[in-house]
Each structure stands twice: as C-alpha cells, then as structure tokens.
Amino acid sequence: GSEMCIRDRYYRNPAENDRAWRYGFYHTGDTAYMDEDGYYWYVGRTDDLIKASGYRIGPFEIESILMEHPSVLECAITAADDPIRGKVVKATIVLTKNYKPSDELAKELQNYVKRSTAPYKYPRIVEFVDELPKTISGKIKRGEIRKNDSEKN
C-alpha cells in the first residue's frame, strides 16, 4: 500500500475546506467503531451508510457476505426508497456465468444474508444487472446506482 498524506487545506476550494476541516480535525467521511477488545472495525463511507428501520447499516458487511455466495461475481449495496419504511437495503448484483436471474435466486440470497448477520440488514430489494458502474480505478459508483434508482421512480 501507499502512505496517505493530508495537506492542511484544499487548494482554492474554501467550501471543501469548511466541509472537511472542523476544529482542527480532518473528517475523512469514513465510519468505524471500536469493539470491546479495542480493535477498530471499518463500517463504510458516511455517504454510503444506509439508515433503514432506525438502524445505521454499512454496505461493506452485506457486500462481503454476498460475495461469499457462489452465484455472486460482484455486488453493491445501496439504499432504495420505500413508501412505508423510508429507505430499505438494496443489492445490485452481477451473477457468475453459471447462474441466471430469478425470483428464487433473489430469495436465496436474501436468506443467505439473514443467516449470516442481523436480519434487519438483509436486502429487501435484489436487482440483477450485467455490470456495475465503476470509476476508472475500478471502484463501484454507488452514487450512480442511487441516481439511476431515483430516476426510475
């Protein structure tokens, strides 16, 4: 890996300085917690966190679980609008070549997540796609998925 260095301000960008720097601290936008043994656990980006049914849900944990299923080549977890709950967890999934999209597979994946973590974290919506939107460096563009979802509604 590479060392990350932070300068004392953004060059010619006062709005970004005001957003990121508060009381002498740089706010990265990453969220983590410390467990009872003193270990830190990465939850995810603040802008990617999902607030659903009163819980804060990080996409990384659910994505990691789904990636263990043999049908999942890659996936992205985002929030989707829900008329009753406000927001729900949505999984956008690219399948491996031996699997085809189906309601049965979606249900299997939902149950797979339920068995591996707290039941409230399971994706209530599963969408199968051919590919996920990515940056040039290969990072998934969750913001683009959310934007596409809001344009559909």
PLM regions and their residue ranges:
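AMP-binding/adenylate-forming catalytic core of the ANL superfamily
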Residues: 3, 8-9, 16-19, 31-120, ...
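Conserved ATP-binding loop and adjacent catalytic segment of the adenylate-forming AMP-binding
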Residues: 7, 22-24, 153
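General small-molecule cofactor/ligand-binding pocket signal
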Residues: 126-129
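Acidic/polar alpha-helix N-cap and adjacent early helical turns
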Residues: 147-153
